Design a protein with these regions (language model features):
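GHKL (Bergerat-fold) ATPase N-terminal catalytic module, capturing the glycine-rich phosphate-binding loop
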Residues: 1-180
Length: 183
């Protein structure tokens, strides 16, 4: 018999549901995870700004939480490094793909910069998906520092995701908007 290799196939929505519900028992964990992501994004912008000053911004580092009871969403905004369309797809479109883990590897390869990595939090790439414990739709709008194009990533956590060009009301950073489930 000839040998052949095949990739595993999976029902992504079921795996995502298992990952979310087995890792997290506290529904409020999503807020900590998203705030950690925002903090990591700011740290990445600061770190990369040391060698590329255009990435630094004149504003203070900011993370903002917005609650809109009328439209039933919670939004976490930051002025961190932001993402481009490829990074959105790679990071948010791949379960257990951590942008922080990749960044830590980059720092590890450049041993002189290890101290910059000490305060980065998210390393496993699943914390973001805890948002689907409380939201039926998640919308991420982001603009990578040093670019002038913004993108929006939208998913219901079941059928996949869409990425499109977007308008953004601040020059860099990310907004994660969770449209809260009815239950």
């Amino acid at each position: 018999m000839d040998k052949f290799t095949k990739s595993f196939e999976a029902d992504t929505s079921k795996i995502l549901n298992i990952v979310i519900n087995s890792l997290y028992s506290d529904r409020d964990i999503f807020l900590r995870e998203l705030l950690s992501n925002a903090s990591d994004a700011i740290q990445k912008r600061r770190f990369q700004g040391q060698t590329t000053p255009i990435l630094l911004n004149s504003e203070d580092d900011q993370i903002e939480i917005v609650i809109n009871k009328k439209k039933k969403y919670i939004e976490i905004k930051d002025n961190g490094i932001g993402l481009n369309d490829e990074e959105l797809s790679e990071t948010l479109g791949t379960i257990a793909k951590s942008g922080t883990a990749g960044f830590l590897k980059e720092i590890e390869d450049n041993k002189d910069s290890k101290s910059a990595a000490q305060s980065l939090i998210g390393k496993f790439g699943v914390g973001f998906y805890s948002a689907f414990m409380v939201a039926d739709t998640v919308e991420v709008t982001t603009q990578k520092a040093g670019t002038n194009v913004a993108y929006t990533w939208v998913s219901d956590g079941q059928t996949g995701y869409d990425i499109s060009k977007a308008e953004i009301d601040h020059p860099i950073g990310t907004s994660v908007r969770l449209f809260i489930k009815k239950d």
